Protein backbone atom coordinates (compact mmCIF):
# COMPACT_ATOMS: atom_id res chain seq x y z
CA UNK A 1 0.00 0.00 0.00
CA UNK A 2 1.39 3.43 -0.98
CA UNK A 3 1.93 6.08 1.67
CA UNK A 4 -0.55 8.95 1.55
CA UNK A 5 0.68 12.48 2.17
CA UNK A 6 -1.98 14.34 4.17
CA UNK A 7 -2.26 18.09 3.74
CA UNK A 8 -5.20 20.42 4.24
CA UNK A 9 -5.79 20.50 0.47
CA UNK A 10 -5.92 16.68 0.25
CA UNK A 11 -8.57 16.32 2.98
CA UNK A 12 -12.05 16.34 1.38
CA UNK A 13 -14.81 16.08 4.01
CA UNK A 14 -17.82 13.94 3.09
CA UNK A 15 -21.48 14.85 3.54
CA UNK A 16 -22.08 17.62 6.06
CA UNK A 17 -18.63 17.37 7.65
CA UNK A 18 -16.44 20.43 8.16
CA UNK A 19 -12.62 20.45 8.60
CA UNK A 20 -11.55 23.22 11.01
CA UNK A 21 -8.10 24.55 11.94
CA UNK A 22 -8.20 24.93 15.71
CA UNK A 23 -7.17 28.30 17.19
CA UNK A 24 -4.25 28.12 19.62
CA UNK A 25 -5.19 27.76 23.28
CA UNK A 26 -3.98 30.20 25.92
CA UNK A 27 -0.46 29.48 27.21
CA UNK A 28 -0.77 31.78 30.27
CA UNK A 29 -3.43 32.89 32.70
CA UNK A 30 -4.42 36.57 32.99
CA UNK A 31 -2.03 36.75 35.97
CA UNK A 32 0.92 35.50 33.89
CA UNK A 33 1.09 31.90 35.15
CA UNK A 34 2.22 29.41 32.48
CA UNK A 35 -0.28 26.59 31.99
CA UNK A 36 0.81 22.97 31.49
CA UNK A 37 -0.91 21.10 28.62
CA UNK A 38 -3.04 19.16 31.11
CA UNK A 39 -4.54 22.39 32.50
CA UNK A 40 -5.41 24.04 29.18
CA UNK A 41 -9.02 24.26 28.05
CA UNK A 42 -9.79 22.56 24.76
CA UNK A 43 -10.30 25.37 22.22
CA UNK A 44 -13.78 25.81 20.76
CA UNK A 45 -12.92 28.36 18.07
CA UNK A 46 -11.31 27.75 14.71
CA UNK A 47 -11.18 28.63 11.03
CA UNK A 48 -12.97 26.53 8.42
CA UNK A 49 -10.30 24.89 6.23
CA UNK A 50 -12.47 22.54 4.10
CA UNK A 51 -16.21 21.99 3.66
CA UNK A 52 -18.06 18.85 2.56
CA UNK A 53 -20.69 18.97 -0.22
CA UNK A 54 -23.56 19.10 2.29
CA UNK A 55 -26.08 16.79 3.88
CA UNK A 56 -27.94 14.46 1.53
CA UNK A 57 -31.71 14.96 1.85
CA UNK A 58 -34.27 12.15 1.52
CA UNK A 59 -35.20 13.34 -1.99
CA UNK A 60 -31.55 13.04 -3.13
CA UNK A 61 -30.82 16.77 -3.14
CA UNK A 62 -28.02 18.30 -1.07
CA UNK A 63 -28.47 20.84 1.70
CA UNK A 64 -25.86 23.55 1.09
CA UNK A 65 -23.53 24.04 4.10
CA UNK A 66 -24.05 27.30 6.02
CA UNK A 67 -20.30 27.89 6.47
CA UNK A 68 -17.56 28.59 3.94
CA UNK A 69 -13.78 28.17 3.85
CA UNK A 70 -12.22 30.97 5.89
CA UNK A 71 -15.16 31.47 8.28
CA UNK A 72 -14.22 31.71 11.96
CA UNK A 73 -16.56 29.42 13.91
CA UNK A 74 -17.46 28.44 17.47
CA UNK A 75 -18.12 24.71 17.88
CA UNK A 76 -19.18 22.26 20.62
CA UNK A 77 -16.42 21.51 23.11
CA UNK A 78 -16.18 17.73 22.65
CA UNK A 79 -17.39 17.47 19.04
CA UNK A 80 -15.58 15.79 16.18
CA UNK A 81 -12.31 13.99 15.67
CA UNK A 82 -9.00 15.70 16.50
CA UNK A 83 -6.35 15.53 13.76
CA UNK A 84 -2.76 16.85 13.68
CA UNK A 85 -1.27 17.90 10.32
CA UNK A 86 2.11 19.56 9.91
CA UNK A 87 2.27 20.75 13.51
CA UNK A 88 -1.22 22.32 13.40
CA UNK A 89 -4.33 20.97 15.12
CA UNK A 90 -7.58 20.39 13.24
CA UNK A 91 -10.98 18.97 14.08
CA UNK A 92 -13.30 17.16 11.65
CA UNK A 93 -16.91 17.51 12.74
CA UNK A 94 -20.49 17.50 11.53
CA UNK A 95 -22.01 20.85 10.59
CA UNK A 96 -24.62 20.44 13.35
CA UNK A 97 -21.79 20.74 15.91
CA UNK A 98 -21.01 24.31 14.78
CA UNK A 99 -22.74 26.71 17.14
CA UNK A 100 -22.01 30.08 15.50
CA UNK A 101 -20.01 31.99 12.91
CA UNK A 102 -17.85 34.60 14.65
CA UNK A 103 -17.36 37.96 12.93
Curated annotation (Swiss-Prot):
SUPFAM superfamilies: GroES-like (SSF50129). Pfam families: Cpn10. GO terms for molecular function: ATP binding; metal ion binding; protein folding chaperone; protein-folding chaperone binding; unfolded protein binding. InterPro entries: Chaperonin_GroES, Chaperonin_GroES_sf, Chaprnonin_Cpn10_CS, GroES-like_sf. Keywords: Chaperone, Cytoplasm. GO terms for biological process: chaperone cofactor-dependent protein refolding. GO terms for cellular component: cytoplasm. Transmembrane segments: none annotated. Its main location: cytoplasm. Signal peptide: none annotated. It comes from the Bacteria. It is found in: Cytoplasm. Heptamer of 7 subunits arranged in a ring. Interacts with the chaperonin GroEL. Belongs to the GroES chaperonin family. Together with the chaperonin GroEL, plays an essential role in assisting protein folding. The GroEL-GroES system forms a nano-cage that allows encapsulation of the non-native substrate proteins and provides a physical environment optimized to promote and accelerate protein folding. GroES binds to the apical surface of the GroEL ring, thereby capping the opening of the GroEL channel. This is Co-chaperonin GroES. It comes from Prochlorococcus marinus (strain AS9601). The gene is groES.
Amino acid sequence: MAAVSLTVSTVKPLGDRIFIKVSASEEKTAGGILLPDSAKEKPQVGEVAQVGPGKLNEDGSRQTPEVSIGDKVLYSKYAGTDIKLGGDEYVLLSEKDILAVVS
